[in-house]
């Protein structure tokens, strides 16, 4: 996975422009659905990594509504390029969740590339 991002030096805001993902899931039975699973996993993980937070006080969760809960919105979603590694002689493997594991590391590398600083 590779991510292209920029960082606003004044605010520290990170903007992800493009994500490229090569994904090996063995026999690809339904390529369109596999791509949709991977795209959803990437967008959800970018949102968790960049914005999402459950806030607490001393006694309870204070994040109680979705209106103020920060998530990645459609206008902020990056272009996502997916290359499926099709291995027709192998059994089908997982498609969606595996893409999530590499997003935070690829994002950290993109921030390093943009700023020269490690998170």
Q: Which role does the model predict for each range below?
A:
Residues 1-119:
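C-terminal catalytic domains of large/alpha subunits in multi-subunit enzymes
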